Amino acid sequence: MSKQGKPFILHSPFKPSGDQPSAIAKLTEGLNDGLAHQTLLGVTGSGKTFTIANVIAQLNRPAMLLAPNKTLAAQLYAEMKAFFPENAVEYFVSYYDYYQPEAYVPSSDTFIEKDASINEQIEQMRLSATKSFLERRDTIVVASVSAIYGLGDVDAYMQMMLHLQLGAIIDQREILARLAELQYTRNDQAFQRSTFRVRGEVIDIFPAESDEIALRVELFDDEIESLSLFDPLTGHSLGKVPRYTIYPKTHYVTPRERILNAIEEIKQELVERREYFIKENKLLEEQRITQRTQFDIEMMNELGYCSGIENYSRYLSGRKEGEPPPTLFDYMPADGLLIIDESHVTVPQIGGMYRGDRARKETLVQYGFRLPSALDNRPLRFEEFERLAPQTIYVSATPGNYELEKSNGDVVDQVVRPTGLLDPIIEVRPVATQVDDVLSEIHKRVAVDERVLITTLTKKMAEDLTDYLDEHGVRVRYLHSDIDTVERVEIIHDLRMGMFDVLVGINLLREGLDMPEVSLVAILDADKEGFLRSERSLIQTIGRAARNLNGKAILYGDRITNSMQKAITETERRREKQQKYNEEHGITPQALNKKVGELLDIGQTDKPKRGKQAVKVEEKSANTYKPKSRKELEKELKQLEQQMRDFAKDLEFEKAAAVRDKIGQLKAVLLEV
């Protein structure tokens, strides 16, 4: 497949300044010289993302940005989209809204079935990401650690593509059969992703990786007479194309002959496993593995896939025992560039994924729920990740020992902010009066319309403090680990918008969150040495106030610990360097006017594809709906109607009625537009 060689075109009203030009030059030079590992030490607000965008544009090579969580991935994706509107900027995170992996608890003899609800929008974005890597050179994929988990084999995936070309000789039956192999379904009523409809000699196909473009194939006898793109919602033509490639519905589709070969290998492994269980006198396990595996084989024979097909990925991808699974890295071009954001968090995360997954699967294998080959359906081990990773830039305000070691201690410094903003002033105050002291500081900040972050050591302390502040008339919210990604983004958005003034949390107010309105960070019990009060944690937390002109951090402690001292020293070093730069260049620190963007609605679709979890229907009044256009309203209406039908089909009539009421409200709004 020939790849388009379009260059990266960076759009920005700003030119690199401060430490950015030297950082861009050093990183680019290092990459051109073939350095495998480089570290960018960039403080909060120094424009690390802009620096990386410049490096990508200068190198003109495809890139993958790894973020430690979905919130930061969404933020990075939005920023990169703004920098490169003409290029392919994609988003690749876990597509599960809810995921319960299959597991067995021997102590209570409880088997937990796999249960999941898949977010269709994120699934489409994942397919779009791999398509861009395969088709285009000007691709940036922003991913979470989901990138190290097994994906379908890239060779099998490419083998399954359906290439359509103007004038090609192919009959209608063959096209429909190939679409069925790609797991597309025929649906002449509801035209949605991964479906096709047939009207005479016209086939309309809604590609799995697309959200707003469909393909119309017009045949004359056995010849493709016309290929045209159209808007699936309005039916408006978007122009003709000479050729088009239809990608499979999922990354896990496999050619028929490979499935048949895999089935033979699975049967062979099943024979060996049964012999082992009989020899060990484990008759229940022998019966269990036989029953489960034979059912899966039957399904694969008839349909080409089965529930939990990923557990047979070793055979389907033709890999040997213990070999690394195919992942997003296999789809990435060989000369790609890897940028690991907030590397001090992301790198340890990559290392920890394999072990947790392995422990759960070993129990399933031991008790006859899975064949031993299921152990090869796993995330990459850390050493495999290291072997697969291309040239890498680690980005962090507090790089970890691993990154420093890999870069041979040679760190690219980006401490000076183009805005002239200084690191927060740090004060240490006694613990005894910390709560009352924080309250008085909050009143000062609220009076000038600024926000406050407070970080505590325990959940109990955070809850009690939130209640206490609430009783004293403070508009306060508590951010805790039970809050899902989407709600977390909403809370941070509401804080910036001034819906409330104080946010209390434990370990949730650290890496990478952009909140220029926050002028005070209060760290309670700062003198309790440990993970939450380590040098890196303190620097990261203090950094949340570094985007404000009046930034200040108060550390409450009765003594200055080693970690506190290091954090204070490093913050002062950065402050002095910035001050010197400001004096030399006559810069007056400027407040950041970073506008509060519209909430990213990535993955906020109403309907999960499957899963036993009940889908919550939000009760919204008609004036909650403020879409940008009539087209968006119609799209939402279509989604709700589909959701209502699904609930009715599952005999969930109360939920169907709630959605029906929602549809009524939306139709009322539609009449006014």
Curated annotation (Swiss-Prot):
GO biological process: nucleotide-excision repair; SOS response
Domain Helicase C-terminal: 434-600
Domain UVR residues, every copy: 634-669
One of the Pfam families matching this protein, by short name: ResIII
Record domain Helicase ATP-binding: where: 29-188
Keywords, alphabetical: ATP-binding, Cytoplasm, DNA damage, DNA excision, DNA repair, Excision nuclease, Helicase, Hydrolase, Nucleotide-binding, SOS response
SUPFAM superfamilies the UniProt entry points to: C-terminal UvrC-binding domain of UvrB, P-loop containing nucleoside triphosphate hydrolases
Keyword ATP-binding recorded: yes
Cellular localisation: Cytoplasm
Disulfide bonds: none
Alphabetical list of InterPro entries matching this protein: Helicase/UvrB_N, Helicase_ATP-bd, Helicase_C-like, P-loop_NTPase, UVR_dom, UVR_dom_sf, UvrB, UvrB_inter
Spans annotated as Disordered: 607-632
Function: The UvrABC repair system catalyzes the recognition and processing of DNA lesions. A damage recognition complex composed of 2 UvrA and 2 UvrB subunits scans DNA for abnormalities. Upon binding of the UvrA(2)B(2) complex to a putative damaged site, the DNA wraps around one UvrB monomer. DNA wrap is dependent on ATP binding by UvrB and probably causes local melting of the DNA helix, facilitating insertion of UvrB beta-hairpin between the DNA strands. Then UvrB probes one DNA strand for the presence of a lesion.
NCBIfam families in the cross-refs: PRK05298.1, uvrb
Domain free text: The beta-hairpin motif is involved in DNA binding.
Oligomer and partners: Forms a heterotetramer with UvrA during the search for lesions. Interacts with UvrC in an incision complex.
PANTHER family, alphabetized: UVRABC SYSTEM PROTEIN B
Protein name: UvrABC system protein B
Native source organism of the sequence: Actinobacillus pleuropneumoniae serotype 5b (strain L20)
